[in-house]
């Protein structure tokens, strides 16, 4: 598929980006009132209502043993809006046991990239910390993190998360 975008900020920027599904043949089915595999139901958008504008997008695929999280947040120094203040991190586990409700992950920071451009010389992705994503239910989770490097080095904490939007069918 393809993502087409157009900014309305007067810059005239628009374009399209080819998309490729990272995990093929994802299927979900239900059996009675509960999903046959609750792991898929944990995928979605999560946030802390007290920190609007920040959160996680999580994709859990037990069929391929894959978990991916994108964390959008701000610099720990309280830098204002814009490039200097925004932070995007990704997180992946070294291994994942389907059915696990607590998932240890490595946090990665990518720097040097350019929007809607192929990989550029100097762009790099490095491990900058660790996190644990623990699901209490289909609607509540915690994100505990520690940064050991990168632009947020020394920061740590735990964030109580709520699901954005309705619960998947069969989730409680």
Give the ranges of each region predicted by the language model.
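Mature soluble binding/inhibitory domains
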Residues: 2-172
């Amino acid at each position: 598929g393809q993502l087409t975008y157009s900014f309305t900020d007067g810059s005239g920027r628009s374009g399209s980006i080819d998309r490729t599904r990272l995990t093929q043949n994802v299927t979900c089915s239900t059996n009675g009132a509960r999903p046959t595999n609750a792991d898929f139901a944990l995928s979605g958008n999560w946030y802390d209502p007290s920190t609007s504008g920040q959160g996680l997008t999580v994709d859990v695929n037990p069929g391929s043993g894959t978990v991916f999280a994108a964390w959008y947040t701000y610099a720990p120094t309280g830098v204002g809006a814009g490039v200097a203040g925004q932070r995007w991190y990704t997180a992946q586990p070294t291994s994942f046991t389907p059915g696990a409700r607590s998932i240890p992950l490595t946090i990665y920071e990518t720097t040097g990239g350019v929007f809607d451009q192929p990989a550029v010389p100097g762009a790099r992705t490095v491990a900058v910390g660790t996190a644990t994503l623990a699901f209490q239910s289909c609607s509540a989770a915690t994100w505990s993190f520690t940064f050991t490097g990168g632009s947020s080095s020394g920061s740590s904490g735990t964030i109580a998360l709520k699901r954005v939007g309705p619960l998947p069918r069969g989730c409680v």
